[in-house]
Amino acid sequence: AGGLETAADVLVLDLEDGLPSGRKAEGRDRARRAAAHAPVWLRISAAGTLDGEDDLALGRELDDRLAGVVLAMCAGPADVAHVAASLPDGVPIVAMVESAAALLAAPAIAAHPATRRLAFGTGDFRRDTGMSADRLALSWPRAQLVVASAAAGIAGPIDGPCGPVDHARDAALHAVAMGFTGTLALQDAAVPGAHAGFTPAPDEVERARALLSASPDGPVDGSYAPTLARARALVERAEALAAL
């Protein structure tokens, strides 16, 4: 069999929650086989745990066949530092914020030089805090991740799973409105809906391009700069999604 196929922008092989504890070694073997066909992203167990150390050992073994890691249950910047020191230089690390303590540490996690993005682990976060899945309840933690990412100068965070297939587009639209730049999907069938939610409408793109075309190339009034920045970001997002 060849490599794994998906409509998603990035396929992440889940070594943390993808298999029960007694079958973790089986999951690593599958990842090893997949990496023979193309570099892979791995979701690894929490730093400092036995499973986490075994996952890092696999990452070192894969070397340049490791495209990046999603660090589950990241507790703080020390976890990012440990993972970065345990893997080949420059491997992208997406740190998952999945607890109340991790949310409070999000600015420091985002500011670590090895952190590429933050991701919101909504299920475990809700379990830790007792919050419901209601969007209003989760709006504050989502905003904290967006602000932490912006302050650290990294791309906006990745939202938690976009839910059932028929909810994926609406969940993605909400993520965009909150300032997220991606979402997780547990089903390949949910990916088209998520893509649709993140893809700007044609009339939005047309207005943004017209605004940029009509704007001067030199310095602009400070009050106008945010409008241009939003237009530029929208066009860039549309072009990136069109290229997928």
Question: What is each residue range found by the language model?
Answer:
Residues 1-244:
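Expand to "…catalyze enediolate/carbanion chemistry for C-C bond making/breaking, isomerization
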